[in-house]
Amino acid sequence: MSEIRLFVTTTEKQAAAVLDVMSAIFEEDDYAIATMEIDEKRDVWEASVYMMTDEEESVRSRLAQALEVEFSHLPIEREVLPDVDWIAKSLEGLAPVRAGRFVIHGSHDRDKVKPGEIAIEIDAGQAFGTGHHGTTAGCLEMLASVARSRPVRNALDLGTGSGVLAIAAWKLLHVPVLATDIDPIATRVAADNARRNGVVTGLTFATAPGFHSTTFSTNGPFDLIIANILARPLMKMAPQLVANLAPGGSVILSGILAEQRWKVLAAYNGQNLKHARTLWRNGWVTIHLTR
Ligand SMILES: C[S@@+](CC[C@H](N)C(=O)[O-])C[C@H]1O[C@@H](n2cnc3c(N)ncnc32)[C@H](O)[C@@H]1O
């Protein structure tokens, strides 16, 4: 699923007014977030709605309706953002990847696993997460370090993709893990991967956008929440994510470009989480926060 941006181009003052309208209509959505930014090359302002959803047409019509009163003269433009081609990215590289105690390998590399390593077998396929991307590797490394420092009795992997992080958490911690994704193909692939890795109980899969499912209250609150999604949805869902975190719990966030980390930290500091550690991998950051 690609990230789509619907936006209007205007002056700074008018962009701020448009942003107010956008924020009001998308306040309750998990998958759409409104923001404004300057395009320095053209010296114009853009008020945008970013989303990862199949419901672009419905978002567009709600937006058009809301802008029709005061801003109908501003055309709604559209951009497909290139940095979320998860499936193409999951096909990058096939050699085993090592992070923390984990080695993620394809079925052709079973003999490369060394004694003492926690092996996870994932073949590149229809969902993101072979371990090659800096965000996945960062989460694996952070997971190993959090497990050394804090007791974890259950975990949530939000945006599970191939299921790699959920399987890693289960193999490392031996605790119940809930794994969810907005994309039903991902949850099916993740469940298949779990079976291939010998995980038959203790790992639950569900398809849900953000926290919109009763499965979170049934299985939570969680001592550990891992969310490798994207900076904007992570900021948007900060209040719900923290509401599902157990007292003393840990959060691992990734999918964040280095330059976006301050905004993400500010959103979670605003929910009373404290920064514990940041890891950098290929321009991406993975952040550990605690309650
Ligand atoms: C970068 S991939 C991460 C996959 C895997 N967890 C990993 O670390 O390699 C992000 C995943 O989050 C899912 N996703 C995006 N927005 C979501 C949302 N609002 N709620 C749940 N899942 C979401 C995508 O479908 C995708 O599978």
Swiss-Prot record:
Its main location: cytoplasm. Its EC number is 2.1.1.-. SUPFAM superfamilies: S-adenosyl-L-methionine-dependent methyltransferases. The keyword Signal does not apply. GO terms for biological process: methylation. It catalyses: L-lysyl-[protein] + 3 S-adenosyl-L-methionine = N(6),N(6),N(6)-trimethyl-L-lysyl-[protein] + 3 S-adenosyl-L-homocysteine + 3 H(+). Keywords: Cytoplasm, Methyltransferase, S-adenosyl-L-methionine, Transferase. GO terms for molecular function: protein-lysine N-methyltransferase activity. GO terms for cellular component: cytoplasm. Pfam families: PrmA (PF06325). It is found in: Cytoplasm. It comes from the Bacteria. InterPro entries: Ribosomal_L11_MeTrfase_PrmA, Ribosomal_PrmA_MeTrfase, SAM-dependent_MTases_sf. S-adenosyl-L-methionine binds at residues 136, 159, 181, 228. Signal peptide: none annotated. The keyword Cytoplasm applies. HAMAP family: Methyltr_PrmA. Methylates ribosomal protein L11. Belongs to the methyltransferase superfamily. PrmA family. This is Ribosomal protein L11 methyltransferase. The gene is prmA.
